[in-house]
Structure formats: C-alpha cells, structure tokens
C-alpha cells in the first residue's frame, strides 16, 4: 500500500441510545463504506478485503455495539493489529450521553436496553457503561450527545471527519419524462409540459435539448423566460434553507412528456445557473430512450 491508497477507518461505538445509527448515516452521506455490527473477530478478514479493493474502499465506518459484547477480546486484538498497519488510518469515535438522557430516549422509543431486556433501562445503562470503560479510554474522539439533536450530531461528525470538498452541499439536477415515471429520489419536481414542444417540429423530433437548435427553440419563448426567472428565484431561495437543515444533497427533477427536449433544455440551464455557487451534477435520465412523446 502507498500513501495514495491509505484507508481511513472509523470505528463507531459507545452507549446504546447515544446516536450510533445517526452517526453511521452521517458517514454514509460522506461517502464512507458503512458496516453495522461487524463482529470484531471478522475485522482482520475485513481489512484484507479492503486491501484487495484497489482503492474502492478507502473510507470505511464500522459500527460496533453490545450485540457483539462477547467478542470484545477479539476487538482488542484487532485494534492492536490495526496500529501495526501503516496504510490504515484508524479512529475510534465513542458516543456518550448522560444516564438521564439515555433513560429518556429509551422511554420515548419504548425500546428495551440490550443489557436489561426485561428490566429497567438504568440497570442496563450502568452495566454497559462499566463494560465500555476501556473502549472509551482508547477512543480518539468522545462525543457527548446529551444535548444534541440528530441534525446537530450529524453536523459535528461532518465537521470532524469531512474534507472541505465533502462538506459541500450537492445539488443534482435531472431531466426526465413523465411517461417513464417520476424519479423516486426526487426532492423537488417541476412539470414543464406547458411549454411549446419541439417534438412536433419534424426535423427536431430526433434531436434532444442537448442540441443547440432545440435549446434555442425552447428558450426563445416568453413563457420560458418567465418560468426560468421564477424557478431560479425559488431554487436560489430554497437551497440555503435545505443546507441549513442538514441535507447533504438535493435532487431537483424537471420533467416533460418524454424527457427529450424541454426538460433537458431547462435542466441544462438550471445546472449552469447554480454551478457558480454549488456543487452541481446534471443528468438526463431518459434522453437515450428516444421512444417519442
């Protein structure tokens, strides 16, 4: 392994109810390969798989909790082994919270503590805290989540573990055809079927909004300009608020009948408009289908 192939590994552990699920989701948003509840005895084998991935798994987050408590002796050995591998950059993130906070969270979710499935949550919390003493001592980072909302925990993790590029709010702008269905991952959907349709001009029928003749045709109409003015104003207003609420990306879908002409033209326009301020990815889901409107 060379420096360029170094693997960044984060082991997420801590008190049950302290936010490990939110933490794993946050790392997933940052592009980490995430595994929850990996038995420590499998960690050496997992490391071998990472080494063989040829850079495809260069950021990994592993969630370990008390469902694997009988394997803690294996964990200590695996952690010692990690320290000897110079091409792995290991971090242990320990999530903690006050006993009273954890009790409240268990009551709110009506779940049993894993160490007190039939008893009081506090008994399980006390036993777990004792069991995790050594793990907490070995942690690189300890986060107290007692006063953190899920969004605030995510923001802390993003701040601690992401690069400047990874912190960028990503905007995906895509065109689609309603005849093929609305994209299931779309956050915002705009219907532009009210605009004049180049499909009915014979020589434009086989073209798409990526062709200058089609885009010029769509953009020449007054209603197109008015719509784009209102659309860009709306999106420009909304994006900072979505970012503030903790979203890592926003998918904006613009649809026409077949996803060939109007939606493609406007998607290209919106993408270019947003790129100076945001990390933007433009895609055209149905542009290759060319099945007609």
Curated annotation (Swiss-Prot):
SUPFAM superfamilies reported in the protein's UniProt record: P-loop containing nucleoside triphosphate hydrolases
Keywords of the record: ATP-binding, GTP-binding, Nucleotide-binding
A Pfam family assignment: PapZ_C
Binding residues annotated for ATP, in chain numbering: 14-21
Record: residues binding GTP: 65-68
InterPro entries: P-loop_NTPase, RapZ-like, RapZ-like_N, RapZ_C
Residues making up the signal peptide according to the UniProt record: none
An annotated Gene Ontology molecular function: GTP binding
Task performed by this protein: Displays ATPase and GTPase activities.
Family label: Belongs to the RapZ-like family.
Name under which the protein is recorded: Nucleotide-binding protein BCG9842_B5683
